[in-house]
Amino acid sequence: MKACAYAKDLDYIDADINARIQDMRIVTKVSLSDEEAEFDGKSLTTEQMKVLLKYYETCQEPRRKEFLEMFFFAFHACGLRVVDVMTLQWSHINFDKKELRKIMIKTNKRHVIPLSEPAIRILRHWQEKRPDSKYVFNLVKEDLDLDNAEELYRCRNNATKCINQSLNVVGEQLGLDFSLSMHVARHTFAIVALNKGLSMTVVSRLLGHGSTDITEKVYAKFLPETLAAEVARISPELNQFVPTIQ
């Protein structure tokens, strides 16, 4: 795999071909069950997201601002898990196709995510900051061995703890009654997507869930807006068949 990446750097093989070869890499699956803990309803409302964005724009602490950029990237990258934000490489990004192609650490499956303009803007910003880096975000060492499960698990825990501690301070300053974390970005994306009418199947694929059963179990009970909207949409048809009650 390293030889293919080197060949790509020397323009011996096409970047798309290299990306597909890298997708074939078999890694030891890391136990990350705690990362997909039962959803407890902690997500940000539209107004809270606006307040958080305003906080970011006025933040004077460089590292905290970087963590907020990672939070917003995870949100705009279809709820990308923190471990995949942490291990995201420039080789996973195709700016021309506006997509992210990566083997997800938790599922060990190839996943393709369409990149929105906000996500691309964040990536371009980090590309300017770290033009010669392997990893997009400065959360792990450049020589991190993704095939070393223990090292990956340790790095994931350290990075998550560091980011979430900083985000939690932000949440407290904004008056949130729960801990702000990277996983909140994932849940917020899912809730927004479902309430905007995306099907459970589509959202499940974007989140990288193994099946829609997982998505339904976690999110279905938090979707009264979507259910009400769907009923309202078909009401004109249903109302044709109302019996006259005497």
Q: Which role does the model predict for each range below?
A:
Residues 131, 139-150, 232-246:
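C-terminal secondary-structure termini that scaffold catalytic or DNA-interacting sites
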Residues 92-99, 177-178, 198-218, 246:
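Short, polar N-cap/turn motifs at the start of nucleic acid-interacting alpha helices
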Residues 38-42, 107-125, 133-169:
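C-terminal catalytic core of Y-nucleophile DNA break-rejoin enzymes
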Residues 114, 121, 126, 221-246:
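DNA/chromatin major-groove-contacting recognition/catalytic segments
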Residues 1-22:
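N-terminal DNA-binding recognition helix of tyrosine site-specific recombinases/integrases
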Residues 104, 142-143, 207-233:
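Catalytic-site neighborhood detector that most strongly recognizes the C-terminal catalytic loop/helix
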Residues 15-82, 86:
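Basic, Lys/Arg- and aromatic-enriched nucleic-acid-binding interface segment
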Residues 72, 76, 80, 186-210:
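C-terminal catalytic core of tyrosine-transesterase DNA break-rejoin enzymes
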